[in-house]
Amino acid sequence: MSDSLRIIFAGTPDFAARHLGALLSSQHQIVGVFTQPDRPAGRGNKLTPSPVKVLAEQHDIPIFQPKSLRPEENQHLVADLNADIMVVVAYGLILPASVLAMPRLGCINVHGSLLPRWRGAAPIQRSLWAGDAKTGVTIMQMDVGLDTGDMLHKIECDIQPEDTSATLYDKLAQLGPQGLLVTLQQLAEGSAQPEVQDEAQVTYAEKLSKEEAKLDWSLSAVQLERCIRAFNPWPVSYFVVDEQPIKVWQAQVLATVDNAAPGTIIHADKHGIQVATADGVLNITQLQPAGKKAMSAADLLNSRREWFTLGNQLA
């Protein structure tokens, strides 16, 4: 059998487009691309194609944008392409069991964690939120469960103390295509060795919410600093002062010990705004008031020092 596979690609955001780009540079043949319908975006709410659609159009690949793959007529779109395998990366639609069984080699998925840790919607963010020392990418054979399929390939990635969801996303978007190409080669050769996930090690990466982004001063400084990095670039951590929401882009944990009530400002200068927490002190260094650009603590103190006087309480 040839090492070249007939592939259907299903994906939507930039993370997926980077994987499609790697496949387009490989020996494999992309016979069709499935992506989410165009969505309103930007100030004018103009209908905007997904990054995957844009890339597919540049390469004249047939594009399909069903709202669901449950209707039988939409499932025929998959069957008629006669693919060897379907590669799914952040597609955003559920694949019914009948679709999973259509390609000769089934469907595989690129997931942004070391499964079985962080199954679900937000694995990159939750790995930071939990203070994990490492994460990575798992290529798995898809089944009807939520990220429950057998694992085909893993690549690990250390999480650095300064990593945010944005930087970790970029790292995994580079590792994922590498792992995908290795996995496809193994499947083409018949040398893949599926590994069953250990159910005892499963954790779930719940979807992020805007409500979760509000800094809870009853948590420790360590946990709050993790939240700030995990929620960058979305939904972005924030606190409220003088009824104004202030986004927080960067902060650090100080070794300082302070007995002030959580949420109390204990010091503010050009090096940061120091806030007492349930355990430790958080030094906030980059902030963004509503309607303004992100700025240093020094710049915000120059214009709004009254917000950050000693003893003020942040909500």
Curated annotation (Swiss-Prot):
- Top-rank EC class of the record's enzyme: transferase
Q: Could you tell me the EC number(s) of this protein?
A: 2.1.2.9
Give the InterPro entries listed for this entry.
Answer: Fmt, Formyl_trans_C, Formyl_trans_C_sf, Formyl_transf_N, Formyl_transf_N_sf, Formyl_transferase-like_C_sf, GART_AS, Met-tRNA-FMT_C
Metal-binding found in the keyword field: no
Q: Name one GO cellular component term.
A: cytosol
Recorded catalytic activity of this chain's protein:
L-methionyl-tRNA(fMet) + (6R)-10-formyltetrahydrofolate = N-formyl-L-methionyl-tRNA(fMet) + (6S)-5,6,7,8-tetrahydrofolate + H(+)
Fetch the CDD domains from UniProt: FMT_core_Met-tRNA-FMT_N (cd08646), Met_tRNA_FMT_C (cd08704)
> Which domain of life does the UniProt lineage start with?
Bacteria
- The keyword Methyltransferase is annotated on this UniProt entry: no
Q: Which GO terms describe its molecular function?
A: methionyl-tRNA formyltransferase activity
Q: Where is the signal peptide?
A: none
Residue numbers binding (6S)-5,6,7,8-tetrahydrofolate: S113, L114, L115, P116
Read off the Pfam families from this record.
Answer: Formyl_trans_C, Formyl_trans_N
Record keywords, A-Z:
Protein biosynthesis, Transferase
- Role summary: Attaches a formyl group to the free amino group of methionyl-tRNA(fMet). The formyl group appears to play a dual role in the initiator identity of N-formylmethionyl-tRNA by promoting its recognition by IF2 and preventing the misappropriation of this tRNA by the elongation apparatus.
User: Mind telling me which HAMAP family this protein's record contains?
Assistant: Formyl_trans
Among NCBIfam families, the record links this protein to:
fmt
Q: Of which family is this protein a member? A: Belongs to the Fmt family.
Q: What is this protein called?
A: Methionyl-tRNA formyltransferase
Q: Which organism is it from?
A: Yersinia enterocolitica serotype O:8 / biotype 1B (strain NCTC 13174 / 8081)
Which lineage is the organism of this entry classified under, starting from the top rank? Answer: Bacteria, Pseudomonadati, Pseudomonadota, Gammaproteobacteria, Enterobacterales
